[in-house]
């Protein structure tokens, strides 16, 4: 998911995406440990997606705090 697509989401949608991505990452790591994972690069892409989601969420938190001051 691109940063532009993430910025179009609402804050609650971003939080939901973070939650589902973390679950996916957990499952991928479990598959890797048991030797069932064939597409190991998927772990990297999910981690980067989580980072993008968290970055946009934090940007919004900062904007809200600036608006309240």
Swiss-Prot record:
One Pfam family from the UniProt entry?
A: Ribosomal_L29
InterPro entries the UniProt entry points to: Ribosomal_protein_uL29, Ribosomal_uL29, Ribosomal_uL29_sf
Name the domain of life: Bacteria
What is the designated name of this protein? Large ribosomal subunit protein uL29
Q: Which GO terms describe its biological process?
A: translation
Keyword Lyase attributed: no
Q: Name one GO molecular function term.
A: structural constituent of ribosome
Which keywords annotate this record? Ribonucleoprotein, Ribosomal protein
Which SUPFAM superfamilies would you find in this protein's record? Answer: Ribosomal protein L29 (L29p) (SSF46561)
- Report the sequence similarity comment from the record: Belongs to the universal ribosomal protein uL29 family.
Disulfide-bonded cysteine pairs: these are: none
* GO annotation, cellular component aspect: cytosolic large ribosomal subunit
What NCBIfam families does the entry give?
L29 (TIGR00012)
């Amino acid at each position: 998911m691109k940063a532009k697509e993430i910025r179009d989401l609402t804050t609650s949608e971003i939080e939901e995406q973070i939650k589902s991505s973390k679950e996916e990452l957990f499952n991928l790591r479990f598959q890797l440990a048991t030797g069932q994972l064939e597409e190991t690069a998927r772990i990297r892409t999910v981690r980067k997606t989580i980072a993008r989601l968290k970055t946009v969420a934090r940007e919004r938190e900062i904007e809200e705090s600036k608006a309240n001051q």
